[in-house]
Amino acid sequence: HVLPGEDPDAAQVLEDVFERRGMTVLRRSRAESAVRTADGVRVTLADGRTVEGSHCLMAVGSVPNTEDLGLDGAGVRTSASGHVEVDLVSRTSARGVYAAGDCTGVLLLASVAAMQGRIAMWHALGAAVAPLDLRTVSSNVFTDPEIGSVGYTQADVDAGRVNAEVVTLPLATNARAKMQGITDGFVKVICRRGTRIVIGGVVVAPHASELIFGLALAVEQRLTVDQVAAT
């Protein structure tokens, strides 16, 4: 699938949309190299196939720029990838030194960086702080349609890491979506068996980055499915 780190059902929706719009999706393919040609670029895949075009967009993520900061001399431990290692209150291995943001490699989101920074500030000032809890942090992929997710995932349920039920509602069954002619997307809710407390969810829809807020609040406040449905 595209977006291998996201919910597989969400990735499938995007693949279907991409192909319907005329895009060719090469599944289970990895790029080995890219070279400039006389009139464009040629990408060679791991299986030997080649793809040619006018341009190649390199969407390979980012790497931390920590190599020349003298962190080793200060006693700040980094990982093999160069990320600064921190605990859940943003402390590094050096006493009195904190780190926050993408350089830590902890869920590379602006909102998480802000949380880490606030936690580091208050902890440095001696205040009692709650450690960073990524299970209540929502993340978004700004594709069309968008993907919003929070908490435990379908993969967690399938692997038995959490005893939960998963309910998926197609967006096409929603009255507003019908009126707007929107057929691609869904809302997936993950809740614990027995207590029915919401512990995760996925939204694939236009403006999913805004719609996920309701599920994120339910996860953070440990609301049950019935409590959410009654609002």
Per-region residue spans from a language model:
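Flexible, glycine-rich terminal cap/loop adjacent to redox cofactors
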Residues: L125-G126, V137, F142-T231
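FAD-site-proximal beta/loop scaffold in flavoenzymes
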Residues: T50-G126
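Rossmann-like dinucleotide-binding cores of NAD(P)H-dependent redox enzymes
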Residues: H1-A38, R42, L107-A114, W122-D156
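Glycine/Thr-rich phosphate-binding loops of Rossmann-like dinucleotide-binding domains
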Residues: L3, N65-D68, A80, L107, ...
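Short loop/edge segments at beta-strand edges and connector loops
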Residues: R27-S29, A80, T168
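Conserved beta-strand-loop-beta-strand element in the redox core of flavoprotein oxidoreductases
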Residues: V35-T50, C56
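Conserved beta-strand segments of alpha/beta enzyme cores
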Residues: T24-V25, T50, R77, N163-E165
